[in-house]
Regions:
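Conserved non-transmembrane functional hotspots
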Residues: 2-46, 92, 97-183
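Alpha-helical transmembrane segments and their immediate juxtamembrane boundary regions
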Residues: 37-101, 171-208
């Protein structure tokens, strides 16, 4: 009798642990989907911005005048065109939008599994080993069929983990902001570098 009670308790504990893991994984993958979709939207806007700059400068640099100005204009347009090509390739390689959709489908399936577990929780005494193994297999299948989420997705998934990993979250947020800022001001940096280089060359040519 004691052995049976111990077995039932163990099964229920395993069942509760599985429910907790499914819930945490679902929340983390919701955050992963949001992160990837936001990343896609940001880089897509950057690509549009670069396309607009290429168009503006292409019109602006028409008939600049002397050969030196035309050379500078050509360099700027070439760099912007290559940057636009790079970002287009980068977006295609990273595939942020499709990966975000994949995570959305995955967490929806995890939600279905979680509902199944919660419905089964109404009668915990009748939970069997085979039933728990079947639920575990469903959970493992959902984990393996998609890429894994990042640690940051787990850190921001609920209030408790946000408080526990606050320093790591802040580090990630600041690093992400710096990267986005550098990407956004990249055209300004390039223009400044080309103008500075051209000015220094002209200055040296005068004094030599």
């Amino acid at each position: 009798m004691e052995k049976e009670e111990k077995l039932e308790k163990t099964n229920f504990d395993v069942f509760e642990d599985l429910k907790r893991r499914v819930r945490f994984t679902r929340k983390a993958r919701i955050q992963a989907s949001k992160r990837l979709r936001e990343r896609h939207e940001f880089f897509e806007k950057v690509s549009y911005f670069y396309s607009l700059l290429v168009l503006i400068f292409s019109v602006w640099f028409l008939n600049m005048g002397n050969d030196k100005e035309n050379l500078v204009a050509t360099k700027i347009l070439l760099i912007f065109s290559l940057s636009l090509t790079f970002f287009t390739m980068f977006l295609n390689i990273k595939n942020y939008k499709e990966r975000a959709s994949s995570f959305e489908l995955n967490y929806q399936n995890l939600d279905i599994l979680l509902n199944k577990i919660e419905r089964r929780e109404c009668d915990p005494e009748s939970i069997t080993d085979e039933e728990i193994k079947g639920l575990h297999r469903e959970y493992e299948k959902l984990l393996l069929e998609k890429e894994n989420h990042l640690d940051i997705d787990y850190y921001v998934s609920n209030k408790k983990t946000r408080e526990k990993y606050a320093s790591k979250i802040n580090q990630y947020v600041w690093r992400d902001r710096v990267v986005k800022c550098l990407v956004a001001i990249y055209p300004i940096i390039i223009i400044f570098a080309i103008v500075l280089y051209t000015w220094l060359n002209s200055l040296l040519a005068i004094h030599l």
